[in-house]
From Swiss-Prot:
Family: Belongs to the Lgt family.
Lineage: Bacteria, Bacillati, Bacillota, Bacilli, Bacillales
InterPro entries reported for this sequence: Lgt (IPR001640)
Organism: Staphylococcus saprophyticus subsp. saprophyticus (strain ATCC 15305 / DSM 20229 / NCIMB 8711 / NCTC 7292 / S-41)
Protein name according to UniProt: Phosphatidylglycerol--prolipoprotein diacylglyceryl transferase
Subcellular location: Cell membrane
Keywords: Cell membrane, Membrane, Transferase, Transmembrane, Transmembrane helix
NCBIfam families for the chain: lgt
């Protein structure tokens, strides 16, 4: 097995600036997602600048809202440490906040450019879930987003590389590698979406992304020890996962009943709103 001792969250330093693995890995996920989506955009016929605008601005505002979302639910801490609020490189962003910010930004751009949001959502959805799967390794590098304590033998029985086991040893205890579970789930989701997309109607791939990601996140979140809590034992991420599953299912049903959406591979660029009504 591959062996590696403790991984320093800081990849390298440029003078007074510390560059963390967390940021590097997040950036890698975004770039890889862009290149994958680019191939689909070419096939459909969207202009390349459209994809750049949507991914760039959705990523920017997604990160901003993800941080605001996290800070809001950790306000008792940040009100005492306001100087740490912009320190996003230390971790502390909430994916669901990022999804909200990214979705809203993407919809606004689609409206401005007269693009069908469901069609572009189908293009980007596989890239999004792959990027999320890659991004979880940023949590690993930061030694965060893990589950409860376990024994070393438990981790060894998972047959995972030694470097993961070694870096799940935090403050004298071994922890459940929940980042890995979610990463594997997301990568599997990416493969499934890519394989199914050409057979689905426009909008279905995006909805399946919401459903698939949320199912995995719901169960993984139940193992984590750092969940944002709403009240009592209600985990915000689990509540949001349920909401997104419902949204995904409802949109799929409504679009099948009310609209005659073409298949993903059968058409070129569609406008906003598309002429799909039965």
């Amino acid at each position: 097995m591959m062996t590696l001792s403790y991984i320093d969250p800081i990849a390298f330093e440029l003078g007074p600036i510390s560059v963390r693995w967390y940021g590097i890995i997040i950036a890698m996920g975004i770039l890889l997602g862009y290149f994958i989506a680019q191939a689909s955009v070419k096939r459909i016929g969207f202009h390349q600048d459209t994809l750049v605008d949507i991914i760039f601005w959705s990523a920017i505002f997604g990160f901003i809202i993800a941080r605001i979302y996290f800070v809001i639910f950790q306000w008792p801490y940040y009100v005492q440490h306001p100087i740490e609020i912009p320190m996003i490189w230390q971790g502390g962003i909430a994916i669901h906040g990022g999804l909200i910010g990214g979705f809203v930004t993407g919809i606004i751009i689609c409206k401005q450019k007269n693009i069908n949001p469901f069609q572009i959502g189908d293009v980007i959805a596989p890239s999004m879930i792959l990027g999320q799967g890659i991004g979880r390794w940023g949590n690993f590098m930061n030694h965060e987003a893990h589950g409860g304590t376990v024994s070393k033998s438990f981790l060894e029985n998972l047959h995972i590389p030694d470097f993961i086991i070694n870096n799940m040893y935090i403050d004298g205890k071994y922890y459940q590698p929940t980042f890995l579970y979610e990463s594997i789930w997301d990568v599997l989701g990416f493969v499934i979406l890519i394989l199914l997309r050409k057979h689905l109607r426009i909008g279905d791939t995006f909805c399946l992304y919401l459903i698939w990601y949320s199912i995995g996140r719901f169960f993984v979140e139940g193992m984590r020890t750092d969940s944002l809590m709403l009240a009592g034992d209600i985990r915000i991420a689990q509540l949001m996962s349920i909401i997104l599953i419902i949204i995904g299912v409802v949109i799929m049903i409504v679009r099948r009943v009310k609209y005659d959406a073409p298949r993903y591979k059968a058409v070129g660029p569609l406008s906003w709103p598309s002429k799909e009504v039965k």
